[in-house]
Amino acid sequence: MADTLQNLMAAFNGESNASAKYAVYSEKAKADGYLAVAALFAAASNAESLHAARHARVIKSLGGEAKAEIGTYVGKDIQDMLKEAIAGETEEFTEMYPGFIAEAEAAGQKAAVASFKGAMEAEIVHAKLYTEALNNLDAWKAKRSFFVCTICGWTEADNAPEKCPICNVPSDKFAEF
């Protein structure tokens, strides 16, 4: 359980920092005229804060206290922000979360497994959307909407799904960005 608690705390810190960073990146993308990229970063910032909150609830249930050390973030060139976001999200779903899930499963920590898996699935979508933006930046200047499940943080482009693919809540539980 100690490893699972440490992993939850690391994930909480990471998701909290990603949320803060993406909020800054959203403002920079908007200022640079990339409205769809700005909306995506805003949606992802919200999703990351939801992941952090879910991790925090599990941390508390295990007797821990969720604490994050939030870094200072500044906007960069649009391509650099997207590349950094892709790298971070990819590391989470290819390395960090699979390892955390394996350890939590071995420890029988079902709530931690669910929290890690939900975040991991959303990170896959974030990386895909960031990659789409990077590969076709001009198309991402126009306004575009993104929808975030307010329960688990799943993110969808253009329209909310009928049901969340992670937690199965209906489309009215999605917030638009």
Question: What does each of the following model-derived ranges do?
Answer:
Residues M1-F177:
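Non-heme di-metal
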